[in-house]
């Protein structure tokens, strides 16, 4: 039984999908005005792992993650570059998808764009106005009335009188006052940048409405899992939930899952500190496996720190896991033994049990290390039980698949066999120079 922490209830709950055997999951995607940083990469990995876990436990999954391709930042960048908003958005969408591929994430099944859902967004806003949950200012802007939804605050767990001042401006661009300082924009009138016709005049939609409509259009009025970074709980997810409550009388998703933030050398990553790490640069430097291992080494609800120390620790841990897997494969091949038919089901089940417990990756890593320890013990015996060792190896590789980490075991050739024989002969003859040279060649080939 998979259990997930639900931000809405503040509890770890048994997971029961709406439709037996199938899961609908939506994760908020990026506003595409710049390249993805490592903070953007964390939810890519977290929810990719969750999807893999759900599938390993027998569910089919429809995974949707959007692109916000209309926004003031996109418009400003297009103006600076003398190009179109569409060209700016497409450039960063392409780059974002490349990061996903570089991270070995399974691409979402559906990646809707705001600009492709404008008719539905306008219709949704119009319904909110007619339902009395939204109002139109004299300047033609449309705002959602947070006081019209008694449950407002159920995601962030804040009452209206407890919310931080400044979470939403009191006055809009035209100077018309809001009825409540926390009312948020559904539609903004503008004469700048890309805009659409609406019942209230030409303008653009507010951010919070876009995701609700894309969920409804692609998955329906209620889904199983809504995911995203912790920073989206308020106001974005709170405001999504409020709009859905207003029109469809539900909170959009049964499980609200949020990952914590990424720090750089113990400090919050921010443009002002100049410590932004671009995701593609990280993958290029560390590689896919090490990046994913580091990100998953910390529970997804705890802050993740990127530093030289945490990278070094992750690299040592990866070596501790990968080397025995390679050695087990090489020694089996040298002995002329076929691969085992199955895997160690008990070890794999222990790993899944940890992952099923709110994706407890630290405990799951402990299972990996324990299984690797057994592989090492098996390889140190005089007469290796290759069947047992190989089942352990295959169970670890299945664990790593859920973490999105790939294992490429070396294939031993006839030339490799001769080199191993030469190494052993040199050691037996105490010809240390020849032995060292043979060992170096074996290491270069990834066989030691």
Predicted features along the sequence, with ranges:
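Short phosphate-binding/catalytic loops that engage adenosine nucleotides
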Residues: 59, 133, 447
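Alpha-helical recognition segments enriched in aromatics with Gly/Pro capping
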Residues: 1-33, 48, 119-329
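N-terminal, positively charged nucleic-acid-binding surface of large information/translation enzymes
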Residues: 9-12, 18-106
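An acidic site on a long C-lobe helix of protein kinase domains
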Residues: 92, 116-120, 364
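The substrate-binding groove and active-site-proximal loops of carbohydrate-active enzymes
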Residues: 79-85, 109-115, 229
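Structural preference for alpha-helix termini/caps and helix-kink/transition segments
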Residues: 268, 277-448
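N-terminal, positively charged, Ser/Thr/Ala/Gly-biased leader segments
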Residues: 98-132
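Alpha-helix C-terminal capping/helix-coil junction sites
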Residues: 55, 101, 129-130, 257, ...
């Amino acid at each position: 039984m998979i259990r997930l922490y639900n931000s809405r209830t503040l509890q770890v709950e048994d997971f029961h999908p709406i439709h037996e055997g199938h899961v609908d999951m939506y994760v908020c995607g990026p506003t595409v005005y710049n390249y993805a940083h490592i903070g953007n990469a964390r939810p890519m990995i977290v929810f990719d792992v969750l999807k893999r876990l759900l599938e390993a436990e027998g569910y089919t999954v429809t995974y949707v993650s959007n692109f916000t391709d209309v926004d003031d930042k996109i418009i400003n960048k297009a103006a600076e570059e003398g190009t179109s908003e569409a060209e700016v958005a497409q450039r960063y969408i392409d780059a974002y998808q490349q990061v996903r591929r570089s991270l070995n994430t399974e691409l979402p099944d559906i990646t809707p764009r705001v600009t492709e859902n404008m008719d539905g967004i306008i219709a949704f806003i119009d319904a909110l106005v007619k339902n009395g949950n939204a109002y139109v200012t004299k300047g033609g802007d449309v705002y959602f009335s947070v006081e019209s939804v008694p449950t407002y605050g159920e995601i962030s767990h804040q009452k209206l009188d407890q919310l931080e001042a400044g979470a939403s401006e009191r006055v809009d661009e035209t100077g018309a006052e809001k009825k409540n300082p926390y009312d948020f924009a559904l539609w903004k009138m503008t004469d700048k940048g890309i805009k659409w016709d609406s019942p209230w005049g030409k303008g653009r939609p507010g951010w919070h409405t876009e995701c609700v409509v894309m969920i409804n259009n692609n998955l329906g009025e209620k889904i199983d899992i809504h995911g995203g970074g912790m920073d989206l709980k308020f106001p974005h997810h709170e405001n999504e939930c409020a709009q859905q409550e207003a029109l469809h009388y539900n909170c959009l998703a049964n499980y609200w899952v949020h990952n914590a933030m990424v720090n750089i050398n113990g400090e919050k990553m921010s443009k002002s500190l100049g410590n932004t790490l671009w995701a593609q640069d990280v993958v290029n430097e560390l590689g896919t496996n090490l990046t994913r291992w580091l990100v998953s080494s910390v529970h997804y609800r705890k802050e993740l720190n990127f530093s030289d120390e945490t990278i070094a620790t992750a690299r040592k841990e990866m070596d501790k896991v990968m080397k025995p897997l390679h050695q087990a494969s090489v020694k089996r091949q040298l002995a002329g033994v076929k691969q085992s038919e199955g895997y160690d089901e008990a070890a794999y089940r222990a790993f899944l049990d940890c992952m099923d417990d709110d994706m407890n990756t630290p405990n799951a890593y402990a299972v990996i290390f324990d299984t690797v320890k057994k592989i090492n013990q098996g390889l140190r015996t005089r007469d290796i039980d290759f069947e047992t060792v190989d089942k352990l190896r295959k169970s670890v590789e299945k664990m790593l698949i859920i973490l999105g980490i790939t294992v490429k075991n070396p294939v031993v050739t006839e030339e490799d066999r001769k080199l191993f024989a030469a190494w052993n002969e040199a050691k037996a003859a105490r010809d240390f120079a020849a032995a060292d040279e043979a060992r170096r060649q074996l290491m270069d080939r990834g066989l030691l």
